[in-house]
Design a protein with these regions (language model features):
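Class I SAM-dependent methyltransferase Rossmann-like catalytic core
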Residues: 2-49
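S-adenosylmethionine/decaboxylated-SAM
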Residues: 27, 35-229
Length: 229
């Protein structure tokens, strides 16, 4: 009983702290740039009060930084963030839909290329962005098709899935994340309604149907939240 009360109090505290948090872009590219989407995303995460967070598809690390700020506001240093990404374009991305890594703003291009001398999509650049939380963050470079099989997913209580958009990749990522759901965790999938990547929706719908999970479509059909019934 006391444990449930404590969880409720922590959840309320996290949501109060969230009111002071805004989804910041940190002078980088992010897919959550549309009005209020970032704040809604953070609010959704806060409602679950996770401590062990996995992001599949880190890109420039903007969402990672926002998530770490949120988790710190709720748990101080008692949280863990794990991020998987290829951190670059190579042969493994040839069949994938990769976000445009070039800036529309020439000032940002100059800043990264000539001042920081960094590729913002590199492991080095993302590590630099997250250095404030270096003791809480574990970034892993590689293909999720291979990496997830080697991870102890039972320790993760929240997955944000925004990696490869090919049907087989999404299917694989979801299947390897099953232990998270078995432990009453949450998987939040981005780009559920992405018209030029129909494999995302197909893989999610099949996964939910086969396993008889609960699915909730959020924010104008953009996100699919999967949990046990």
């Amino acid at each position: 009983m006391q444990q449930n009360i404590l969880k409720h109090q922590l959840k309320e505290l996290g949501q109060k702290l969230l009111a002071k948090l805004k989804y910041k872009k940190y002078f980088r590219k992010t897919s959550l740039k549309q009005k209020d989407v970032g704040e809604k995303f953070l609010n959704e995460i806060a409602s679950k009060n996770p401590k062990n967070f996995l992001e599949i598809g880190v890109f420039h690390g903007v969402t990672a930084r926002n998530v770490c700020e949120l988790l710190y506001s709720m748990h101080k240093n008692d949280f863990k963030y794990v991020g998987l990404d290829l951190f670059g374009i190579n042969d493994e991305t040839s069949n994938e839909i990769i976000p445009n890594t070039k800036f529309n703003n020439p000032l940002k291009q100059i800043y990264f290329q000539y001042i920081l001398n960094q590729d913002p999509y590199s492991l080095e650049a993302v590590t630099h962005l997250l250095k404030k939380f270096k003791n809480n963050v574990h970034l892993i470079k590689g293909n999720s098709n291979n990496l997830l099989k080697k991870m102890d997913m039972s320790k993760i209580d929240y997955v944000f899935l925004d990696g490869g958009h090919a049907y087989e990749t999404v299917k694989n990522d979801l299947e390897n994340s099953l232990p998270v759901l078995d432990n009453n965790g949450t998987i939040l999938c981005d780009d559920y309604n992405l018209s030029y990547a129909p494999g995302v929706k197909k893989a999610i719908d099949e996964f939910v149907l086969v396993n008889d999970f609960k699915i909730e479509i959020l924010f104008d059909y953009r996100f699919a939240k999967i949990e046990k019934k």
